[in-house]
């Protein structure tokens, strides 16, 4: 099975401009491809995971990745799939986020000796002269055609600013510059970027008379059709300070049964033959498949040592083995805990619940226990007197979410 066939078998490919040409480039290791990342936060998250894994997979096959950081386009905001205008960011915030991205991407991509490139589109977009843009790029775009693009449809009903309308032109110009300056012949992106990607291939054809290609990556959706990578406390981040290795492990350990094999195929580097055997697994074996998924992805992001620690901590909890230092922890001043904290406050502070209203419902539905005992009253207060032998309160939400409380 060649590289392109494996991408298809793993369910990674959605749309392509020219399958034969793209397949040929990838299989021969001649693809110089780019994926864009808007630095709208100081960490990458699970939503970026598919792209990072694809870049790693293709680099291993001899192709050259370009990670394009949207330092310039982040100052505009991408309307694709959005119903509201994104808040504009300062240059300082963007630059900080770019540095954070570099560090995280290096875990997936080898940037040594020119094997991959990290490029910031601020390098060319911020110096563009408006008249030059109108003269060089403007003639190659039809407003009528742009307005029919999928990426603008949602915003048209509620209002699309001229600022955001320019996003397609900017992204198309990115591809043009990467093709011209770095020999980039292929762009990857999500389905919601398809119109912008086609704009780039068209601009290259019109200005340079040459062919470039585009391919969209399958979105990472669960069995209910919702994007994966969200919890009650927000996004699942790749930064250990934002989402601990244990929380990251638990997220994948707790995926629905229907999603396990799909995630193994799309995100891990295990051989397909090994994964296909797991498709027949049921019951306890399926839980083993979830452990494999969680371990492999945690190892990829946080390293083998952290993956092993997270796996041990998870198994201890499920076996009733008590608290370990790898479980997410919130620490209060001892004086505050001596006075007591009510269960609703604890649930919100630990982000096991998004609000006091949600916390109240969890308790009333019998979904919360502390140190193995179910909490029945919404006004139940806990102090250091209730600490267990590990000097902690172990809060459990539902069957799979844990958090410990300690005193400083």
Outline where the language-model segments fall.
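Conserved nucleotide- and phosphate/pyrophosphate-binding catalytic cores
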Residues: 204-408
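NTP-dependent nucleotidyl-transfer catalytic core
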Residues: 1-193, 198-201, 208-213, 328
